[in-house]
């Protein structure tokens, strides 16, 4: 009986493949550059080579691989393995799953990368042990994956869970999706970076200027570090940003009432400095609607391994 699966986290810069055992533990992994742009056929061959190489490097016979799972950006039909459109790669109507099955000679599952990462947290991370979970990643945008009754919520067009594009400010900041006021324009890590830069430009006396003299080096962590040193300007930026995070989390609770919400992305490394006020804000916003036990709000545990583990577990998500 096959003991291993391979999970692939396919990104625009790198692609990582991991050999995962029956306990959802990574026993070996390998990362290669994605090397875009290139034809889809070339990338498929590289993915097949990556799978065979990670198996060989870890002394696993490829015949012992039960299946391969892939998490990729884009609109993914999980049933067919068909990627309708991948904006990161510029591929339209990409027949990824069937093509890779032909190259590898085994079953291949393809899933949206946010869903795969969420499933990883559900299987082996911060959402383990819960039936209903939402995983939110605060990064360049806001990624989200929803697990209800132990199953990924995909929607009839396989596009469910785009929580980052829920509008929270009418006629607000323009979003790349075409709408205005989307949650990710206010609560993503890039939104925090944008507001930090604006605050620094408005206040030349903030200690953030002593921490970096170049606005191009400002990141989402800077305001947290400055606020911890007592900087009032940084504290105002953080408080405003956390309120926007809390608004979206309250919407998640009112919509899905999950048992647990896991927050990921680099800013989640702030731990309770981030989580405690988000928890308090969301609880206050939902207390007159949601009765009973408030959802657990915690940080993701698997970090960069969530996508690999989730992809490797896709066969159990059916």
Say what each PLM segment does.
Residues 110-112:
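Short loop/edge segments at beta-strand edges and connector loops
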Residues 33-35, 91, 159-162:
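A short acidic/small-residue loop/turn micro-motif
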Residues 1-67, 77-80, 98-108, 123-130, ...:
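ATP-binding/phosphotransfer module of carbohydrate and carboxylate kinases, centering on a glycine-rich
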Residues 9, 69-73, 135-141, 145-147:
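Short beta-strand segments
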Residues 146-162:
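Short, charged low-complexity linear segments at domain edges
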Residues 117-123, 144-146, 165-166:
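Adenylate-forming
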Residues 30-32, 87, 156:
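Short hydrophobic alpha-helix segments
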Residues 81-92:
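A charged helix-plus-loop insertion that forms the helical arch/lid used to bind
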